[in-house]
């Protein structure tokens, strides 16, 4: 399903923030990142160059993105970022694009919408995988700076570019398989690195739990449990389908 009605800056962030590699037999990497580029209608070419396809919404902007450096995804940091050169009719600019867990990136933005937490937690509660997007232009950076700059200096003072939301349906036989395991006296346990709200939704879908799940939410970077809060069900009036950016 194509991604439409997003700003050029969000499109550039989506096009740049990935770890896909082009080999002789095609693009290799995370299926969700491949899906994102396909939905955006951009394509990866040789030399880490990403351009809009002929039918892309941004084709008229005559832009291209060339990734110069990647800070790979880290499960501890919960994010990844890239430094890229963006070519436009007006000239060349240097773009930092960051993608990661919404709770982690929140402190890196210069400002966030008032409904930031409500929005991403609402999507997560419905079983979707949610990533926050951020960017900034650093036009004074030369080639030497690109190769030597520290990650901490890159991933700060970002502009919020939206949420990337993936709807990931269960495999057709998931519920049946887990029921068979439970019926044969096997205890089914979920271990996941996903958002707890997403995990709780999936656990209900596959019938690991059959009641409301209450989650103790400890703030990112907290050194004690004094700042913990209880996550309660949210009531939001929207539906999900495919990949969407909001």
At which residue positions do the language-model features occur?
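Cytosolic catalytic regions of ATP/NTP-dependent phosphoryl-transfer enzymes
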Residues: 1-160, 166, 179-208
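C-terminal cap/substrate-recognition subdomain and adjoining C-terminal extension
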Residues: 176-179, 210-246
């Amino acid at each position: 399903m194509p991604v439409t009605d997003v700003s050029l800056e969000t499109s550039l962030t989506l096009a740049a923030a990935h770890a896909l590699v082009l080999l002789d037999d095609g693009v290799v990497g995370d299926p969700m990142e491949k899906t994102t580029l396909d939905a955006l209608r951009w394509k990866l070419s040789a030399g880490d160059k990403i351009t809009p396809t002929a039918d892309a919404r941004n084709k008229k902007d005559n832009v291209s993105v060339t990734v110069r450096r990647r800070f790979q995804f880290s499960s501890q940091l919960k994010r990844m970022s890239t430094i890229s050169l963006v070519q436009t009719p007006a000239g060349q600019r240097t773009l930092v694009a960051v993608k990661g867990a919404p709770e982690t990136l929140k402190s890196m933005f210069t400002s966030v919408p008032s409904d930031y937490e409500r929005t991403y937690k609402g999507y997560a509660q419905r079983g979707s995988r949610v990533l926050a997007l951020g960017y900034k232009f650093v036009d004074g950076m030369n080639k030497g700076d690109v190769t030597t700059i520290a990650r901490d200096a890159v991933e700060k003072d970002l502009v919020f570019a939206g949420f990337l939301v993936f709807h990931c349906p269960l495999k057709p036989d998931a519920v049946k398989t887990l029921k068979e395991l439970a019926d044969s006296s096997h205890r089914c346990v979920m271990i996941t690195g996903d958002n707890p709200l997403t995990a709780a939704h999936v656990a209900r879908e596959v019938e690991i739990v059959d009641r409301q799940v209450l989650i103790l939410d400890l703030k990112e970077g907290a050194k004690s449990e004094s700042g913990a809060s209880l996550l309660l069900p949210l009531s939001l009036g929207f539906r999900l389908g495919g990949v969407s950016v909001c």
